[in-house]
């Protein structure tokens, strides 16, 4: 799976890349929200990990843009933040974030959250396949015509 990282802090970005690559992910790392948005529009990412506070475009605005972007597949978004207040959490969820990881990064916590993301993405892919393969039933009778 290819993951887009948006993190302006070089040390945090390098740590994220190292952890993710060690886990076998393909990583595209960007230094701010503007670069991340451009990369997102050019590539196909099922997972985005973004810092909240960044120059150019912050993580919340990046999240909003991703949610408004027309694409065929759902993108799971994990926000990274040093802000841990309820207001910050709710604002992120309202912007469209799926999950949060707090700084400083804990590799074990990140791995656990990535496993959750993979399960949800896999479920969504399976559900999309089911929708295409199986037309809805009407009153217990298949809607296919013979």
Task: List the model feature ranges, each with a label.
Residues 14-22:
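Charged docking surfaces used in two-component/phosphorelay signaling
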Residues 24-31, 39:
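Short hydrophobic/Thr-rich beta-strand motif most characteristic of the beta2 strand and flanking loop
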Residues 43-49:
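Active-site beta3 strand of CheY-like receiver
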Residues 54:
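Receiver (REC) domain active-site loop signature in two-component systems and cognate sites
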Residues 105-118:
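C-terminal output helix
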């Amino acid at each position: 799976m290819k993951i887009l990282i948006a993190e302006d802090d070089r040390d945090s970005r390098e740590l994220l890349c190292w952890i993710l690559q060690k886990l076998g992910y393909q990583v595209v790392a960007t230094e701010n929200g503007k670069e991340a948005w451009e990369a997102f529009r050019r590539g196909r990412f099922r997972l985005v990990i973004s810092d909240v506070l960044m120059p150019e475009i912050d993580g919340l605005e990046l999240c909003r843009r991703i949610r408004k972007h027309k694409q065929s597949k759902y993108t799971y978004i994990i926000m990274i933040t040093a802000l841990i207040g309820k207001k910050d959490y709710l604002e992120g969820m309202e912007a469209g974030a799926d999950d949060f990881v707090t700084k400083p990064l804990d590799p074990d916590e990140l791995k656990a959250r990535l496993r959750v993301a993979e399960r949800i993405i896999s479920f969504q892919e399976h559900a999309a396949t089911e929708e295409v393969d199986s037309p809805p039933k009407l009153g217990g009778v298949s809607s296919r015509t013979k």
